[in-house]
């Protein structure tokens, strides 16, 4: 075991993201909200965001409701965009549970889909969620990665089944967006309520999607792996 011999040679190298694209450009409303509290220093120095963690801000209900208004606005914008560009109809008042990333077995989109099948069967039994859920997937598979393509096929089949089931549709919606890319991610990330970061523990070196979602106010649902570990340490439970 090389770690026992040279523990100092084994350490993490965290990736990073650019605020210019994933906050300033993607979510100008949230940018203005933050600037109103702490100025614009955070645009060049992420450490400035720590100034938000003060009782004056965290216990200000009026401002916290403003955050909810911004999130609702971005969700409505996403719903309109998907309707106009892809013909996909989603409920902007539902919980947006989003998993967008490269399609790979270790990233476990298939596990997310299996949970949604379980949720579908629960609703059929009469166990309806108190708040509707919209599960959104965005991914592309490598050309020769057959299993990844099969997972996409499974998600699309689930989407079609739910779309044709009037008993389930009001409570659960599954969407696989077409041609997932950066432009679409700029719409999806600010609208997200729950960020799915469920890669198999020990397989994710860092990840950056988790950072983009966290920056835009989503709650992370994830394994204790990659940059999720550092996010957990900073944000807590």
Where are these regions (language model features)?
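Short, well-structured alpha-helical interface segments that form or flank functional binding sites
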Residues: 5-8, 98, 105, 169, ...
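Catalytic binding pocket for nucleotide-activated donors in carbohydrate/polymer assembly enzymes
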Residues: 6-9, 14-54, 190-191, 198-237
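Hydrophobic alpha-helical scaffolding
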Residues: 20, 24, 64-68, 106, ...
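Extended, charge-enriched "interface" segments that sit outside catalytic cores
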Residues: 23-89, 93
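Long, K/E/R/D-enriched contiguous segments that form extended
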Residues: 72-185
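Short, basic, glycine/proline-bearing loop/turn elements
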Residues: 170-171, 193-196
């Amino acid at each position: 075991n090389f770690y026992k011999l040279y523990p100092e040679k084994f350490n993490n190298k965290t990736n990073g993201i650019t605020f210019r694209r994933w906050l300033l450009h993607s979510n100008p409303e949230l940018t203005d909200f933050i600037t109103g509290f702490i100025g614009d220093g955070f645009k060049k120095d992420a450490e400035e965001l720590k100034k938000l963690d003060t009782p004056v801000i965290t216990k200000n209900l009026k401002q916290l409701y403003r955050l909810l208004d911004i999130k609702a606005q971005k969700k409505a914008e996403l719903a309109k965009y998907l309707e106009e560009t892809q013909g996909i109809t989603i409920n902007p008042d539902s919980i947006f549970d989003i998993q967008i990333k490269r399609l790979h077995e270790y990233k476990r989109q298939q596990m997310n889909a299996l949970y949604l099948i379980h949720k579908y069967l629960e609703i059929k039994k009469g166990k309806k969620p108190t708040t509707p859920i919209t599960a959104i997937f965005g991914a592309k598979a490598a050309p020769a990665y057959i299993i990844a393509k099969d997972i996409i096929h499974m998600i699309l089949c689930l989407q079609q089944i739910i779309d044709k089931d009037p008993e389930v549709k009001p409570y659960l919606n599954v969407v696989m967006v077409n041609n997932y890319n950066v432009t679409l991610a700029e719409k999806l990330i600010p609208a997200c309520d729950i960020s799915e970061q469920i890669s198999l523990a020990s397989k994710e070196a860092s990840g950056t999607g988790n950072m983009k979602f966290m920056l835009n106010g989503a709650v992370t649902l994830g394994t204790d792996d990659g940059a999720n570990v550092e996010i957990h340490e900073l944000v807590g439970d």
